[in-house]
Structure formats: C-alpha cells, structure tokens
UniProtKB/Swiss-Prot annotation:
Signal peptide: none annotated. Component of numerous DCX (DDB1-CUL4-X-box) E3 ubiquitin-protein ligase complexes which consist of a core of DDB1, cullin-4 (CUL4A or CUL4B), DDA1 and RBX1. GO terms for cellular component: Cul4-RING E3 ubiquitin ligase complex. Functions as a component of numerous distinct DCX (DDB1-CUL4-X-box) E3 ubiquitin-protein ligase complexes which mediate the ubiquitination and subsequent proteasomal degradation of target proteins. In the DCX complexes, acts as a scaffolding subunit required to stabilize the complex. Residues 67-101 are annotated as: Disordered. The keyword Translocase does not apply. This is DET1- and DDB1-associated protein 1. Belongs to the DDA1 family. It holds the Pfam family DDA1.
Amino acid sequence: MADFLKGLPVYNESNFSRFHADSVCKASNRRPSVYLPTREYPSDQIIVTEKTNILLRYLHQQWDKKNAAKKRDQDQLEIGETSAPPRKIARTDSQEMNEDT
C-alpha cells in the first residue's frame, strides 16, 4: 500500500491504518431494495409530466379555491342585476312614525 501512496501530495500512513479492503466488500454484499408494483399497468401507457412548476401549480390551485366562492357570488350578482331590477318595497315603519307625530 505504501507504493500506491508515494505519488500523493500528502502522505501519512496513519491516515490509512484502519482501512481494510475486506470491510468495503462486505457492505456491498447486501441486496438493494427493489420496488415491487402492486398493480398491473398497461405497457403502452404514456406518462406525461406537467410543464409548470409544482409550487406554482399548488399556489394556483389554492388561489382558485380561495377565490371560487367570491367569483361565484359576483357572477350571481351580475346575473341578478341584468335579469330583473330589484323590487322596491314600501317601508311600513315610516308610516307608523308619521302617525305618532
């Protein structure tokens, strides 16, 4: 091992005193974890990714949820105004006040 380290800029044998080549091989003997699918998908299925950023998509969805109720209310007001004018109802309390005086 000393011959291998001779050309390196910093040479100190104690840096590699605990190194054992056998220990590296033992760690790699473990089987890697493998994904096993639970469903069968068609082989001709095409997976398409979204072009927009995930964060931007999430923020747009949240904004749409937040403003959906406001937009719906505004649309109903616009429809109500154009379809029929609001009815005027005579106030009954003003007549009672005039009778008291």
